[in-house]
A protein has these predicted regions:
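Short, well-ordered amphipathic alpha-helical segments that serve as non-catalytic structural scaffolds
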Residues: 77-88, 142, 169, 240-242, ...
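Acyl-CoA/ACP chain-elongation machinery
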Residues: 181-226, 259-273, 303-310, 327-377
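Active-site-proximal alpha-helical scaffold in enzymes
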Residues: 77-90, 139-143, 147-191, 229-250, ...
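ACP-dependent fatty acid/polyketide chain-elongation machinery
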Residues: 1-66, 243-253, 350-364, 408-412
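Phosphate/pyrophosphate-binding loops at sites that engage ATP/ADP/AMP, CoA/4′-phosphopantetheine
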Residues: 84-96, 245-252, 282-298, 320-324
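Glycine-/small-residue-rich "gating" segment that lines the acyl/pantetheine channel
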Residues: 123-130, 168-171, 175, 191-247, ...
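Condensing-enzyme catalytic core mediating Claisen C-C bond formation in acyl metabolism
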Residues: 4-8, 35, 213-289, 298, ...
């Protein structure tokens, strides 16, 4: 018998706030965290804007030595995980460490480490690379560092599915608790690749918006959309088996009730044109949760602001919900914080949980003229306030990776 899984802790580092409270205040206020790139000189780059994390000081979240052994994606992950763990009120002295684990992903890891050490090889020779180059670079170190910092000795893994990584991590952590492998899981995603090779690579792929006005660059579902804006940060949650959470008197934010994951088997970057793969992920999540399409109140879309994603995700929602798609509110958090790649699903799951808590669906900022081919309710022009019972979050990754989480208002 599957065990029920609830959300008991939230953590976030984002372009509009480095804690959940700061982030959610920014979301409610419609704050846009996109601006000129400050990390390097962009004079020769077509793309000059991104959604950078601002004012983050790693040593405020860990000791100096630990911080020096982590690249930004790992630092963001540890900071968000510590916030979520503290929020959940878990005392590891009272827990079996082998029943508490971590599944946190990063789509890329550290391109910065690759850049720095390749320059050393070219200029000074291979003997001059940082001895810690490999552990600084590899994407599993977000999960590894969280495990070390929090003393979690259970399942510790890393899912890499590009822009769906964070959502798959939360889904797989959900499964670990459902089937009895763990009682507590720290899950989500982290990313930081606003650097020369990251921006150049995505620009060459024609994936990024070349608009220089930060308010008009990430405009999901708008007829003038022309690409996504690169973002960074981390979104981490604590998932817990229901009876375990109740036994220790935990505050329960919401219940995670369904998870769907599919593959398009179609193209290395483009989602399937009929939306069937992403639509099936939503259907599977609803089926597991025992929820009908007409019960879905809100969908936090992948909504990247690229032509193909927004059009095909609209088709996917229609495939999954049928006639009920016309009544659901859809939005995109990427309109405010850009695309956090492997961290996107984690941060957007936090948005879904907070939306249920507050009965608040944020506006899709910047979007003013909805593409006629995207014909759903995208929360354009104003936020929506309504009681939310069932909410879905979608993530779609390069390679055809589709993932959907269904979270519901907690009831005994």
């Amino acid at each position: 018998m599957k065990r029920r899984v609830v959300v008991t802790g939230l953590g976030a580092v984002t372009p509009i706030g480095n804690t959940v409270d700061e982030f959610w205040d920014g979301i409610r206020a419609g704050k846009v965290g996109i601006g000129p790139i400050t990390r390097f000189d962009t004079s020769e780059y077509k793309v000059k804007i991104a959604a950078e994390v601002k004012g983050f000081v790693a040593k405020e979240h860990m000791d100096f030595k630990a911080a020096k052994r982590m690249e930004p994606f790992s630092q963001y992950a540890v900071a968000a995980a510590k916030e979520a763990f503290q929020d959940a009120g878990i005392d590891m002295e009272q827990e079996n460490p082998y029943r508490a684990g971590v599944i946190v992903g990063s789509g890329i890891g550290s391109l910065q480490t690759v850049e720095t050490n390749y320059t050393k090889i070219v200029e000074k020779g291979p003997s001059k690379v940082n001895p810690l180059m490999v552990p600084l670079m590899i994407s599993n170190m977000a999960a590894g560092n969280i495990s070390i910092q929090l003393g979690l000795k259970g399942k510790c893994t890393n899912v890499v599915t590009a822009c769906a990584s964070g959502t798959h991590c939360i889904g797989d952590a959900f499964r670990a608790i459902q089937y009895g492998d763990a009682d507590i899981m720290v899950a989500g995603g982290a990313e930081s690749c606003i650097c020369p090779s990251g921006v150049a690579g995505f620009t060459a792929l024609t994936a990024l918006s070349t608009t220089e006005d930060p308010m008009c660059a990430s405009i999901p579902f708008d007829e003038k959309r022309n690409g996504f804006v690169l973002g960074e940060g981390a979104g981490i949650v604590v998932l817990e088996e229901l009876e375990h959470a109740k036994a220790r008197g935990a505050h329960i934010y919401a219940e995670l009730a369904g998870y769907g994951a599919t593959g398009d088997a179609y193209h290395i970057t483009s989602p399937a044109e009929d939306g069937e793969g992403a639509g099936m992920a939503m259907k599977l999540a609803m089926e597991e949760a025992g929820v009908q399409p007409e019960q879905i109140d809100y969908i936090n879309a992948h909504g990247t602001s690229t032509h193909h994603n927004d059009l095909f995700e609209t088709k996917a929602i229609k495939f999954a919900l049928g006639d009920a798609a016309a009544d659901v509110v859809v939005n995109s958090t990427k309109s405010m914080i850009g695309h956090l790649l492997g961290a996107a699903g984690g941060v957007e799951f936090v948005v879904c949980v907070k939306s249920i808590q507050d009965g608040f669906i944020h506006q899709t900022m910047g979007t003013t003229n909805v593409d006629p081919e995207c014909d759903l309710n995208y929360a354009v022009g104003a936020p929506v306030e309504k009681e939310l019972h069932y909410v879905m979050s979608n993530s779609l990754g390069f390679g055809g990776h589709n993932a959907t989480l269904l979270v519901k208002k907690y009831e005994e």
